[in-house]
């Protein structure tokens, strides 16, 4: 009886320890994350192909932000920043281009103005590829390890 109890205990403990071991998928994910973190360290915006600098950045950024608003006609834009070289991630690949920030005050669903909110827009070759309200969850980061920079 004692031997069977010890044998059963060994089997149960082995099962618990096996369940605690990281899965192959988890190990692969950690490896990819480590490779990505290393690639982030090698970003060089001075030598990257960022495409053409947008000469109509205000117009295309305003249009892209208006597309996201409840009441696009009420939007008031102020304090645009000059487009600067930037990088974002799309499907685990770096995309180089330009970013700009702007304050937007627009009406919400109740018809009241929200107050000035800072938006970040990413552009490449005259097109806006991403817009973020920096007040939203994760809105102040481009990707993990790279915060939005509006200065």
Locations of regions flagged by a protein language model:
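Bacterial N-terminal signal peptides that target proteins for export
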Residues: 1-9
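Classic N-terminal secretory signal peptides
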Residues: 11-14
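C-terminal motif of bacterial Sec signal peptides marking the signal peptidase cleavage site
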Residues: 16-19
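Cystatin/cathelin-like cysteine-protease inhibitor module
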Residues: 21-151
């Amino acid at each position: 009886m004692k031997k069977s109890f010890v044998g059963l205990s060994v089997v149960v403990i082995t099962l618990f320890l096996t369940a605690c071991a990281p899965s192959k998928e988890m190990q692969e994910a950690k490896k990819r994350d480590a490779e990505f973190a290393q690639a982030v360290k090698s970003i060089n915006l001075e030598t990257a192909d960022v495409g053409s600098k947008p000469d109509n950045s205000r117009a295309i950024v305003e249009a892209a932000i208006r597309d996201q608003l409840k009441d696009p006609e009420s939007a008031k834009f102020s304090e645009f920043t000059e487009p600067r070289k930037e990088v974002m991630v799309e499907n685990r690949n770096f995309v180089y281009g330009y970013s700009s920030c702007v304050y937007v005050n627009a009406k919400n669903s109740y018809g009241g103005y929200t107050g000035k909110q800072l938006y970040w827009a990413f552009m490449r070759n005259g097109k806006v590829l991403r817009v973020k309200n920096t007040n939203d969850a994760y809105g102040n980061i481009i990707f993990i390890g790279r915060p939005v920079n509006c200065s």
